[in-house]
Amino acid sequence: ASSAAAAXAPSTPLA
């Protein structure tokens, strides 16, 4: 996923 999509998550996308 792009950085912009990850920004929506409250924490890290890997968590």
UniProtKB/Swiss-Prot annotation:
Subcellular location: Mitochondrion; Mitochondrion inner membrane
Keyword Translocase: yes
GO MF: ATP binding
Keywords linked to the UniProt accession: ATP synthesis, ATP-binding, CF(1), Hydrogen ion transport, Ion transport, Membrane, Mitochondrion, Mitochondrion inner membrane, Nucleotide-binding, Translocase, Transport
Origin superkingdom: Eukaryota
Keyword Mitochondrion: yes
Biological processes annotated in GO: ATP biosynthetic process; proton transmembrane transport
Class of enzymatic activity (EC top level): translocase
GO cellular component: a single term: proton-transporting ATP synthase complex
Main location group: mitochondrion
Entry's EC annotation: 7.1.2.2
Catalytic activity: ATP + H2O + 4 H(+)(in) = ADP + phosphate + 5 H(+)(out)
Signal peptide: none
Self-association state and partner proteins as the record states: F-type ATPases have 2 components, CF(1) - the catalytic core - and CF(0) - the membrane proton channel. CF(1) has five subunits: alpha(3), beta(3), gamma(1), delta(1), epsilon(1). CF(0) has three main subunits: a, b and c.
Protein family (similarity comment): Belongs to the ATPase alpha/beta chains family.
Function description: Mitochondrial membrane ATP synthase (F(1)F(0) ATP synthase or Complex V) produces ATP from ADP in the presence of a proton gradient across the membrane which is generated by electron transport complexes of the respiratory chain. F-type ATPases consist of two structural domains, F(1) - containing the extramembraneous catalytic core, and F(0) - containing the membrane proton channel, linked together by a central stalk and a peripheral stalk. During catalysis, ATP synthesis in the catalytic domain of F(1) is coupled via a rotary mechanism of the central stalk subunits to proton translocation.
Protein name: ATP synthase subunit beta, mitochondrial
Organism: Spinacia oleracea (Spinach)
Lineage: Eukaryota, Viridiplantae, Streptophyta, Embryophyta, Tracheophyta
Gene behind the chain: ATPB
